From Swiss-Prot:
Catalytic activity: adenosine + H2O + H(+) = inosine + NH4(+); 2'-deoxyadenosine + H2O + H(+) = 2'-deoxyinosine + NH4(+)
Coiled-coil region: none
GO BP: any one term: inosine biosynthetic process
Origin superkingdom: Bacteria
UniProt family annotation: Belongs to the metallo-dependent hydrolases superfamily. Adenosine and AMP deaminases family. Adenosine deaminase subfamily.
Record protein name field: Adenosine deaminase
Length: 334
């Protein structure tokens, strides 16, 4: 269930993993690209998960058509705006949208800084039109290597006022967090908050690395934390939140089934964990599905689902005053 008295949040939601199939079709035609299909129904299997993928990298390949059609900065602005519209229509009161400017720029060699500007502009327009609070998290795409990530970081820091936090995502096994220490040192020095994808494809050592070497305040996915009791204790004691993405973890074969997902274990251990989507358009789900279908299937009680909902706001990269303003907006006390 979703408690209507609490703000509904999604703090692990990829902007470049939530490009509508119709938009892919529209932009593909606009830029005269050879798409795998020219009709919406036949395009969907190429851009949306239809079966469990064998691993994370295979899952991520489903995102490629979404960014392949970004032939201009206006296209980037459009998908950013549509992401805000989708979040509002999903019933969210607050979301943190993360994006990799290098990944979005790569196919058509767009200026990376221009992509950051376009995304910030599209988000700002969407927030005005749809009355929702959205913050942006910049992603360093580890898959493209250290130099590409430096370019991303430079572009994100050039627009520091529009970026709330920094994330590291991509091929966790091939590109460990230790390669990106200097990137995250710079980000922290600039005042960015830190979240890191870890413990999804790699083991608990990747989570320790994210915390100790990159300064992670939150962990994306983090399912492998359950394999290390000391790590579980540390996460609970230091209130390092886990951004859980239930359906995604099944689709990437990170977890065998919802029944074996560790989210309930995290909550019962006192870890601040929340419920999120990940890549809604690619997954074919929205936040309501995660609360109403996935969370009960993962063994969460109604009380634990409510706790996870409250945790989403507690974990948010905004001030306590902003959190209280959201609470008051959703459930004003006369």
């Amino acid at each position: 269930m979703i408690d209507p008295r609490l703000p509904l949040t999604d703090i692990h939601r990829h902007l470049d993993g939530n490009i509508r199939a119709q938009t892919i079709l529209d932009l593909g035609q606009q830029f005269n690209l050879n798409l795998p299909a020219n009709e919406l129904d036949t395009l969907r299997p190429h851009v949306q998960i239809t079966k469990t993928e064998p691993d994370l990298v295979s899952f991520l390949q489903k995102l490629d058509w979404g960014v392949a059609v970004l032939g201009s900065l206006d296209a980037c602005r459009r998908v950013a705006y549509e992401n805000v519209e989708d979040a509002a229509h999903a019933g969210l009161h607050y979301a943190e949208l993360r994006f990799s400017p290098f990944y979005m720029a790569m196919k058509h060699q767009l200026p990376i800084t221009g992509v950051v500007e376009a995304v910030i502009d599209g988000i700002a327009s969407g927030c005005r039109d749809f009355n929702i609070d959205i913050r942006l998290i910049g992603i360093l795409s580890r898959t493209f290597g250290e130099q590409a990530c430096l370019q991303e970081l430079d572009s994100l820091l050039a627009h520091r006022e529009g970026i709330t936090a920094l994330d590291l995502a991509g091929d966790e096994l091939g590109f460990p967090g230790s390669l990106f220490r200097r990137h995250f040192n710079r980000a922290r020095d600039a005042g960015l908050r830190i979240t890191v994808h870890a413990g999804e494809a790699a083991g608990p050592e990747s989570i320790w690395q994210a915390i100790r070497e990159l300064g992670a305040e939150r962990i994306g996915h983090g399912v492998k934390a359950v394999e290390d009791r000391k790590l579980m204790d540390y996460l609970a004691e230091h209130k390092i939140g886990i951004e859980s993405c239930l359906t995604s973890n099944i689709q990437t074969s990170t977890v065998v089934s919802l029944a074996t997902h560790p989210l309930a274990t995290f909550l019962r251990h006192g870890i601040v964990a929340s419920i999120n989507t990940d890549d809604p358009a690619v997954q074919g789900i929205e936040i309501a599905h995660e609360y109403l279908v996935a969370a009960p299937a993962a063994g969460l009680t109604p009380h634990e689902i409510r706790q996870a909902q409250a945790n989403g706001l507690e974990m948010a990269f905004i001030s306590e005053q902003e959190k209280q303003a959201l609470r008051d907006k959703v459930f004003p006390i006369s």
